[in-house]
Amino acid sequence: MALINFDLLAELPLAYQAFAPTVDVLPLIPLFFFLLVFVWQAAVGFR
């Protein structure tokens, strides 16, 4: 059984540390599209 050190995967590599705030927001983008569907349908009157 291979043991994986998840602590290594918990942080971005040093070269990408500047992008950490962006990476934190990326998982939320699909939720914004999901909510946009309801806003769009409300705008067109739920046809």
Curated annotation (Swiss-Prot):
It is found in: Cellular thylakoid membrane. Residues 1-10 form a propeptide. Its main location: membrane. GO terms for biological process: photosynthesis. It is a single-pass membrane protein. The keyword Transmembrane applies. Keywords: Membrane, Photosynthesis, Photosystem II, Reaction center, Thylakoid, Transmembrane, Transmembrane helix. The keyword Plastid does not apply. Pfam families: PsbK. The chain crosses the membrane at residues 26-46. PSII is composed of 1 copy each of membrane proteins PsbA, PsbB, PsbC, PsbD, PsbE, PsbF, PsbH, PsbI, PsbJ, PsbK, PsbL, PsbM, PsbT, PsbX, PsbY, Psb30/Ycf12, peripheral proteins PsbO, CyanoQ (PsbQ), PsbU, PsbV and a large number of cofactors. It forms dimeric complexes. One of the components of the core complex of photosystem II (PSII). PSII is a light-driven water:plastoquinone oxidoreductase that uses light energy to abstract electrons from H(2)O, generating O(2) and a proton gradient subsequently used for ATP formation. It consists of a core antenna complex that captures photons, and an electron transfer chain that converts photonic excitation into a charge separation. Belongs to the PsbK family. This is Photosystem II reaction center protein K. It comes from Prochlorococcus marinus (strain NATL2A).
